[in-house]
């Protein structure tokens, strides 16, 4: 399977949850200045598609829906013919029809179907049943939306196959897919290896249908599940390039805390597409002109 690459736009460093394992996409700090506009994101989408054929963008954070420019940025990105995935905890979705009008895919964090465990993981008192209601509402408004329920597997909290099964079944009911993610943590006691997550799915009767360097895909009758490797985890650090994080100050990163970074703010603000391209192609070798 040919690897695909994209920009992962960290639109805001802020989040209303406090998940204890959060790696902050792009290794971004809450003090990071918000220097990019919706128009800037439209330029980035256009450049990525024109130069390298990157026709998808993932918007993440922080919690992307905290950002006041989220919807306008989505509109301008979509106008460039680029498909949008939003990664969200779904607690701020007041109107799914308006918020996700420009999305092709929504990935919702749902690490458990147990409200007590959910509160422990997220550090939030936001009710789990409201998140579940939001997932159902998204599906009702967008019957063709790709819907992933992201489940970070944590030892001693939600690594039991029966707990995984509950999210798999709910995902199936809303015509979505459960996506299990290995934990990025220096505390090895709570890390469940990718191979163990795969073993759990096989025990639940799934069969592996395909895989690449970062993901494996499984099926069981009409149900589907995915395991994806977290690019921030030490055990996956030698797997090469995947995606390019763009922080709201114009800094790009491949996500590693020790990663050399470079800033594209000037090139973005000046709409200098050639300068933009040269910096990215130097920094991110998989970026090949089409």
Regions picked out by a protein language model, each given a short descriptive name:
Residues 29-43, 64-105, 109-130, 151-166, ...:
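Canonical radical SAM enzyme core domain
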Residues 43-61:
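Short Fe-S-cluster ligation motifs
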